């Protein structure tokens, strides 16, 4: 019986560790999805600009839900972030191609994270099954004999 109790404690500890890892993966998955969605929105905006001619008016966000009216004077180029605080000017087509690569990277990271999360969930299920088995064994050992 003491051996079963010790095994249950070990299983509970392992379960808590795996649950914490699963929570972190779920949070990472959410951040990756948000990042991918942001890149997708930028890509769609740039694709829309390809069809525009001349100057046109836009709203420029300045923070706290406030905007200024502005005009796009160069709809053939975009300045895109390339990481580490750097941005470069690229043609719309090159910008879209760059964004597609980044979206693909995000999608690969999302797929890997989802796979890791599935594995953790399977491990959690196995630990729960083992714990239930031990608890049933203990319950049978405590049955009242007539």
UniProtKB/Swiss-Prot annotation:
* Organism superkingdom: Archaea
Q: Name its cellular compartments.
A: Cytoplasm
In the record, biological process GO terms are: protein folding
Instruction: Report the principal subcellular site.
Output: cytoplasm
**What keywords sit in the KW lines?**
Chaperone, Cytoplasm
- GO terms for CC? cytoplasm; prefoldin complex
Q: Does the keyword DNA-binding apply?
A: no
What are the recorded GO MF terms, alphabetically? unfolded protein binding
Question: Which InterPro entries would you find in this protein's record?
Answer: PFD_alpha_archaea, Prefoldin, Prefoldin_subunit_alpha
**Quaternary data:** Heterohexamer of two alpha and four beta subunits.
Q: Which PANTHER family match?
A: PREFOLDIN SUBUNIT 5
Protein function: Molecular chaperone capable of stabilizing a range of proteins. Seems to fulfill an ATP-independent, HSP70-like function in archaeal de novo protein folding.
Q: What is this protein called?
A: Prefoldin subunit alpha 1
């Amino acid at each position: 019986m003491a051996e079963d109790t010790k095994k249950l404690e070990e299983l509970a500890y392992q379960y808590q560790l795996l649950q914490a890892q699963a929570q972190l993966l779920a949070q990472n998955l959410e951040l990756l999805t948000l990042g991918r969605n942001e890149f997708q929105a930028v890509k769609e905006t740039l694709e829309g600009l390809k069809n525009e001619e001349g100057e046109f008016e836009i709203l420029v966000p300045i923070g706290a839900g406030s905007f200024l009216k502005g005009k796009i004077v160069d709809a053939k180029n975009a300045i895109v972030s390339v990481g580490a605080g750097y941005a470069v000017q690229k043609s719309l087509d090159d910008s879209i191609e760059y964004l597609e690569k980044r979206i693909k990277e995000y999608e690969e990271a999302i797929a890997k994270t989802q796979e890791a999360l599935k594995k953790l969930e399977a491990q959690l299920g196995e630990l729960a099954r083992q714990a239930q088995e031990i608890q049933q064994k203990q319950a049978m050992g405590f049955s009242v004999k007539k």
